[in-house]
Amino acid sequence: MNESHEAGKNSSTNVEEREEEVLRLARQFTEQSSYSTAGQTPFAAEAGSALDPNGERFNARAWCKAMLQMHIGDKEAHPLRTLGVAFSNLNVHGFGSDTDYQKSVGNVWLKTLSLARIAFGQKQRKVDILQNLEGLVEAGEMLVVLGPPGSGCSTFLKTIAGETYGFHVDKNSNINFQGIAKQMAHEFRGEAIYTAEVDVHFPKLTVGDTLYFAARARTPRHIPGGVNATQYAGHMRDVIMAMFGISHTKNTIVGNDFIRGVSGGERKRVSIAEACLSNAPLQCWDNSTRGLDSANAIEFCKTLRMQADINGTTACVSLYQAPQAAYDYFDKVLVLYEGREIYFGPTSMAKHYFLQMGFVCPDRQTDADFLTSMTSHLERVVQPGYEDRVPRTPDEFAARWKASPQRAQLMQHIKSYNAKFALDGEYLDKFKQSRRAQQAKAQRVSSPYTLSYVQQVKLCLWRGYQRLKADPSVTISSLFGNTIISLVIASIFYNLKADTSTFFQRGALLFFAVLMNALGCGLEMLTLYAQRGIIEKHSRYALYHPSAEAFSSMIMDLPYKILNAITSNIVLYFMTNLRREPGAFFFFVFTSFILTLTMSMFFRSMASLSRSLVQVLPFSAVLLLGLSMYTGFAIPTGYMLGWARWIAYINPISYGFESLMINEFHNRDFPCMDYVPSGPGYTDVGLNNRVCSTVRSVPGQAFVNGNAYIESAYSYTASHKWRNIGVIFAYMFLLGAVYLVATDFITEKKPKGEILVFPRGHKALKKGKSDEDLEGGGGRSATVEKIGSDGLAMIERQTAIFQWKDVCFDIKIGKENCRILDHVDGWVKPGILTALMGVSGAGKTTLLDVLATRTTMGIISGEMLVDGQPRDESFQRKTGYAQQQDLHLSTATVREALEFSALLRQSAHVPRQEKIDYVTEVIKLLDMTEYADAVIGVPGEGLNVEQRKRLTIGVELAARPQLLLFLDEPTSGLDSQTSWAILDLLDKLKKNGQAILCTIHQPSAMLFQRFDRLLFLQAGGRTVYFGEIGQNSQILIDYFVRNGAPPCPPDANPAEWMLDVIGAAPGSHTSINWFETWRRSPEYARVQEHLAELKHERRHQTNLFRTTSGQKREDKDSYREFAAPFWAQLYQVQVRVFQQIWRSPTYIYSKTALCVLSALFVGFSLFHTPNTIQGLQNQMFGIFMLLTLFGQLIQQIMPHFVAQRALYEVRDRPAKTYSWKAFLIANIVVELPWNSLMSVLMFLCWYYPIGLYRNAEPTDAVHLRGTQMWLMIWTFLLFSSTFAHFMIAAFDAAENAGNLGNLLFLLCLLFCGVLATPDQLPRFWIFMYRVSPFTYLVSGMLSVGISNTNVTCADNEYLRFDPVNGTCGEYMGSYMSNLGGYLADEMATANCSFCPIKETNVFLGRVSSSYSDIWRNFGLMWVFIVFNIFAACSLYWWVRVPRDKKPVAKAE
């Protein structure tokens, strides 16, 4: 900015005068606009005018002025408000250290002990992050915050915006938001916002819908211009998209790192646009230009400048690699050095402040880079003679600033500002009035939200519908799966007879129906965790309450739940011949539906009460087990142990089951189908001397009363039918309230400040810094200039030339073909550093993907040759590709990641030790020695951005690429010093003969000059220039000027100038078709000639070499797809996966908790169950309930596997590091030892409490049968883990695989012989009984558990009747000899008490189980395990392994 503008800024201390001046200028601009906008409003603009956001002539400044004028002219519109901030004595600290130790299964308890010590009063180490910051940013001003990573820039911005999680603001710090202080964090939360560096959006929502939602959420109560809220939000969306050049992405999904959507730069602009639509008067932007090209970075700053000038918005922005044009838009600058303030003041004076101190600014270095260089002793240049006079350490710089007259003047301004805007004064009242006028009438005055709660819910409902339309797969698969399950259950219990023979089957049917309806929404937990970060971001922006989104999702799910209740329950009810009465049917459907809603609230509240998925899974599994076991069927109420009976009282499912049982049995008499005694010799016995073989039967009656049956068997009372419905409703509302409240107040787990994490036993090397800060996690790294040539000695020298001609790439969007790359030509030679540049979305990353053969979709055409020969299948592993996203295994160390790449990607003939030594050289070369043994971690707890980028490049260098190195945005997100260090590294590699093709955004003039050649693309993937850059970019500049471009100013950055020339920068236009200009140029002709020469010469040389040298075995091996043989791949991958699991204690201990707690719960719920008839039934259900863990076990494995697979498919597979077979087998095998350990724990915690060992005592087989039971539990866990891999192998989402897995799991449970014995199954389903693995599992476990012992009936299980004559023994002798059973007293002459079962083997026979089949069952379980492994591999190969593409065709 010029000095007159700066002076105007600094003199404007009166906010009211400033606002009046802004309004006066707005009126003047509107009246005298040079654009044809007279008589137009922004909402009724002529098509193609400057106010039309969908037209080519749209002008953002003209639109803003017109919008402001319209707002001023509307008396009902809310008053405009602005917000500045003054801060002094600002100190921020955290607790901890700059390093930590990695938690593993073995040492996590040590961490627990340290936390316990802290809880009992042991003080933590205090770490200062920001120290004594002072500054003043008035309304309408822009502040740029400069400093390297780790200097405290992010912490400062978060503090100003009120986001202080993970650190503490000192209580003596003074922050004055123009007369407002404590209210900013709550009442005015959305008025000061922080926009993080990462982009978090719903990936399958379109860009247009994402931004419409944000605009609508901040729509004011009264809208000037006479349009409704929908039109206003739509117009604001179109305007903001036009401002940031993303109008063309309106109907494209946003995507993320794993779901293809808009480009990375476009996604960043979506994040910026979303934040702008919040209309916050104070905006904090944290490195928001990361991933943007320089033109869009400048346009971003220009837009902020426009908002500040016209609307009075205040912006605080941290920038890395800030172009000079972007820096010039700012009024003030804050320079931070390890948390100390070393300058705060006008941007125009900052450079001079350090120059007069004795430092030198190199030629063509931007002001921002010069200021940032002050924080690095390796970068700052001292004037000769000033070596002993300039400050060196952060404290010396801070002390020099404290003593400066500039600081004294700043403190005077802060004092005046605080006096003018006293806290809680009149400006606070004005601010409240303006905010209130904007809010909906139904909104609370103290609420930070604009819309009323009802409006928020409606808006979230709209978004929910858009998301459902975008991805209905989970809903459809759930509905389909539930309908199939209903059909299967109905067919199993098809047309039940209305007599006593179906009593158990009716109970089992209703039990399964209740569980199916109640537990079918368990996967909702996964969805809630996936979207939590997005919703919390929107809450910080004050767009809506998190509970409003939660409430809308409840409503959004209602149509599905209603449809599911109708389709599933109609099929189930009528096919099974449940009570054929209208009232009974509708009560059944109604009860099932409200149970579904209640349990949906249960799952949602569980998810909202916990902060991560791993926290909740084990406990939710035990709760689900409790809900299922204490429903009243598996363990009838009378058999529940006293200490656990309360579980049934707090279990909503038990109330539903009781009501459905009453609904089915109340006031019905069921004819008796089986009498005792009966058969030969008893045909003439009357009813008085025999009894129905059902509980609560009465001698002399040919039926059993339903009320009596459920009262005796289940202790159910008919009067509870509607009472239970009321209880269920109460639970529904209670759990719903818990869900909504917890959603608003409990946030997800966030990372701490960035710290380095080391494996226990490794120590961080001392770094020679005076102070460490939480944010840095390692401080500044030196440039690679200090590394000598010795580190380069082992770097692979390359000789091959890679060339491409007429490369095109087309994808299908809808029904239309879209061309992403259009006839691109070029080459990469050893020792040449080639830059690939273009506007965001021009296809740079796509071109790298195509050239590196990493695309998995679309149609590729053109010619790509290596030394004149087509690329072979070894091409991918012979090239290095450093991706823009720094994707690494979070649990590995830096050294392990590099060694893994070296061992598997270098030639198999290179000795192992040489590969390890090579990794050591790469570590030295990249200056990673001090953190070589640090854990990679996740952002926030592990390597910082710079360190991750170095590691990404290092992984590719460690592979020793034989052909060339691709780098996608290697300097993205890095500050200028680190970017310069990365270019130092590339320059060293180039000088050693490395061939490099590198995309780059926002290069400074000095950085741009370090490249040799440039491939420049415009939108549509069309070449604008390919050739040398030249000294001071002169060859490039001459080309454009010769073809009609205006001259490049001497002080301009050629990288920014050329974007303006071709009209790629937002707001810039050109009448020249630069693509056609290039195609007609002599430079293009020379490129074509050289490509033909290269093809002929290199092909001839290659063929000659192959003919004269012959083909050695090593040469043949070099053309293999993978460098390492399969067994070497498997070994290395297996070691890494074992390390990863060991270093994931939350995964292992949640698995342990799941198995141990569930086993204990089942075991002690059935503690020492007696061998009565119901006791045997309970023991059988004890096995059955243990098997229900299957669902939770596979749900735990699937998300873990999906994360590993995403990393493999995005990084390791395209690099041909190892094969998919090694990946899949290693992930399956790694579960084996842990499942073995879990089986032992589960066996001990379940087998002995139930008391099954007592059944082996009569035959003296306690140890044998105990071992057999453990083997069956072991195979169950192995089957579960392999089945999980089988399910997830083909699916992208764990939710879809979970739905299918639950469907198959339920089928296994249904057909295992517990709920319906083989004799009761329809003949059609017998094959399912035989193919269900649970058939053999239950049969084996049940026979081992209860065989070969006697049964003792409980008192209510005896059947009582009088003999015809004689004793009971004489009367029942014939019957007992044929059908078994025993009498309590054979000598009794009246009231015979008969027990139908004498031995447990009879009970086993009824469920087709026999102890003699135990080893057959064990063997068959292994058959199923092997089948799962084979099916997982087959499915993965069929669905997810890319097929070899046919030879490319010539593009049209």
UniProtKB/Swiss-Prot annotation:
Disulphide bridges: none
Residue sites binding ATP per the record: 838-845
GO molecular function: ABC-type transporter activity; ATP binding; ATP hydrolysis activity
Native source organism of the sequence: Aspergillus fumigatus (strain ATCC MYA-4609 / CBS 101355 / FGSC A1100 / Af293) (Neosartorya fumigata)
Gene that encodes the chain: abcA
Protein name as annotated: ABC multidrug transporter A-1
Keyword Cell membrane: no
Family membership noted in the UniProt record: Belongs to the ABC transporter superfamily. ABCG family. PDR (TC 3.A.1.205) subfamily.
Signal peptide per UniProt: none
